[in-house]
Amino acid sequence: MMKPTLLTLLLCSAAFLAPAAPVKLIFDTDMGNDVDDVMALDMIHNLQKRGACELLAVTITKDHPQAAAFVDAINTFHGYPDVPIGVVRNGATPEPGKFNKLADEKNPDGSFRFPHDVLSGADAPEAVGLLRKILAAQPDKSVALAQVGFFTNFARLLDSPADEHSPLTGRDLLKQKVTVLSIMAGTFQTVNWETRHLEYNVIKDVPAAQKLAVHWPTPIVWSGYEIGIAAAYPHESIERDFEYVKHHPLKDAYYAYNPPPHDRPTWDPTAVLYAIYPDRGYFDLSPPGGVTVEDNGATWYRPSKDGKGRHRYLVMSAAQAARVREAIVQLCVEPPAGR
């Protein structure tokens, strides 16, 4: 008979060595407004390939039909053509952007440079309905959300009523299913001596940002404007690290958006990195508190007196910034399976 102490040690060792379950992730993006969204989705797929996460859906807050097409092209490039895509209706930034047009680029034989079958946002369902469907099907307290665009979709989800997918309101559904919301938005530290930078993702839909900041029922971790600035993506990687394929969505999008030599801030990838790897020491966190969004889009953080606030923001030392930058680069340049 095995001694109880030895059995206990073996069981503890087995539990310690067991791989962590993949993070169930929903990614909400304004794909097309900046190339860091492409970096973030690239990272997600490479982490999914490693078993670190499971991408349940991508929802889009940029209201242009090519945004969904390019998201599907990226998903397909990485070997995940069936990831559900939902789109905003009557949302912000209806202009095409600089690189979503890559979804329409053709090879000499007439085939798509980046194959995909969602040809337009008109072919995709509305985001809130898709979000409710996906969340309702997941176990309780199992889903992480990464929002790297505007607040429109998630604010509308908050207000959504019961439907065929769930008898719960949007707020109650989120409270039941979601563990954390990791947001790239706002500014919480001084950047180039500017203390009140009005961050893009907030100012494009201020009422939605205000609603979410007040009424969101789960913990929120904010990756502020200052974080991505401090861990900019090195342009040398774009120039050298994607030679394993003639066309890569990230490299092509980077050149279309603002070609090297320039180092692009990694705003959106930092929110994704935290959502999937919150315990790897890439970032520190502020004390618990609350974030207020003013009418002009300014964000203010106040620590809670009782230490029970639901909002925190990312803090990153110079040493952590170097780690974050290298992690993002390696997670972006990794070749998809079979390439």
Where are these regions (language model features)?
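Bacterial N-terminal signal peptides that target proteins for export
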Residues: 1-7
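Hydrophobic h-region of N-terminal signal peptides that target proteins for export
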Residues: 10-19
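N-terminal acidic, glycine/proline-rich low-complexity segments
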Residues: 20-339
